[in-house]
Each structure stands twice: as C-alpha cells, then as structure tokens.
Amino acid sequence: PFPLTSTDTTEYKINENLFDISATYKNFYLYTQLEYSDPPIFGETRTTIDKILNSYYLEYLNEKLNLKLGDIYSVYTRGLMFNTYQDQSTDFNNSISGVELSYLANDWLRIYSLYGTDTYEFRTRPDNQLSDLSFNHTSAFLGTEIHPISDIILNIQYLNQSLNISESVTNEGGVNTIGYYANLFTILGNDIAENISDFSTDNINSYQINADMLGLSLQGYLFGLDFYGEYASNKYT
C-alpha cells in the first residue's frame, strides 16, 4: 500500500496476484477469479481460504436462452440504466450477486432480466487503502430488445433499486453514509441535505430508499449514418 510517512516510491510495495480459472462443458461455462494479495494496491489483504474467491459465475447458453448465476457484470445499451463492472486498479466493483436471464422469443424480440443484491463499498477519499462507507442494495431489471425493421433496435427498460443505508456505518472522521450523500450535488443528495436535520434527530438507524427508473433507447443505421439516442427517468421514494 501507499507509504504513510514517506513519499519515497521505493517504499511502495505490493504483492497482488489474480488467477482467472474457467471451464466449459457442453452448454455450461464456469468462471472464477481468485486473488492472493499481501498487500494489494487497494483493498483488503486476501490470504485465507474464505477471502481468496474474488468473483464467480455459472452460465448456461443455447440458441434461445442465456442464464447466468453468480456475480453479474453486464452493461445494457450504453449503460445509462444498468452497468456493472470491476476495476482492479482502483478496487472498484459494483457487481450484484444474483441471476441474469436473456431469452430470444423470435427474430424481432429478445427479453432480458436480472435480479440480485450485494453490498456496495466505496471511499470518501481516493487514496484510502480500504473502503470506508457502504450500503446494501437490491436491483430488479427488466428489458426488451425489439427489431421493428432491419438495422433498427428499440429497447424498453425498467429498473427498481432498493438502497438500505445504515447510520452505523461511518468513516474514520465520523461521517456516515447519510452525511456523505448530503454533500453531493445530486437529486438524492439535495433531497437528503434538505432533510438532514430530520435524519439527525429521529431514532431510525437504517433508511430504505427506492428508485424506479424507466428507459428508452433507439439505435440503428439509415442512409449511411449510425444514430443512437437514449432517455431515462428516475423517481426516488
């Protein structure tokens, strides 16, 4: 990790090892990523059996059906509605653990869906070795990919996210997740900031925030030109 008392780069030492292991059998595909790190660039040390499994999923694929169980890393359309990925260099991982399904109903219609839950961990400072804040979340996503005519694709999507924010999760400075979001210039942050006194004086330790998103995208190729447009609306309750 970063040296705490010196800026000498020779003191910056890491021992991070990643092992991608996969296997296939007929229509099944198994993927696992193991990590042995002592210490890693960012994140916690992983040297014991209960911590070295970094991610995994089992996938089944045929001509019409694609089913995946485990850690879900996916992007739909341009990612405005749903986008999960892993960036090892910054210890970022917003995947969910659950199930993902895609079904090709016919030549012009594909239906896809996923459901999962996980704990999202993040840092209040980019140079923190460990994540210091977190919240639990559950996502339910449903979409359709429609091909009305050749070279035109229409996507209609719905996403429900449920966030569980606990005041007991605080960083070293004593700021909890509610306080952190109140300082962000977002719709959710502004709403929390306007009601921060109510959050501070009530006897509730955990807050449930629901987000309902509707998305519409259109892409295609006409008259020698590629075009793409996407719209998403979000409502917090």
Explain the meaning of each model-derived region.
Residues 70-72, 114:
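Surface loops and adjacent helix of pleckstrin homology
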Residues 18-20, 68, 100:
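One-face residue pattern on beta-strands with alternating periodicity enriched for small/polar residues
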Residues 54-57, 68, 80-82, 92:
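A broadly used, surface-exposed interaction patch
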Residues 17-21, 55-56:
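Short secondary-structure capping/turn segments at boundaries of alpha-helices and beta-strands
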Residues 2-14, 24, 29-53, 61-64, ...:
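Signature for the C-terminal beta-barrel architecture of outer-membrane proteins
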Residues 38-42, 68, 76-78:
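Short active-site-adjacent helix-start/loop capping segments
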Residues 73-80, 84:
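Surface-exposed extracellular loop regions of Gram-negative outer-membrane beta-barrel proteins
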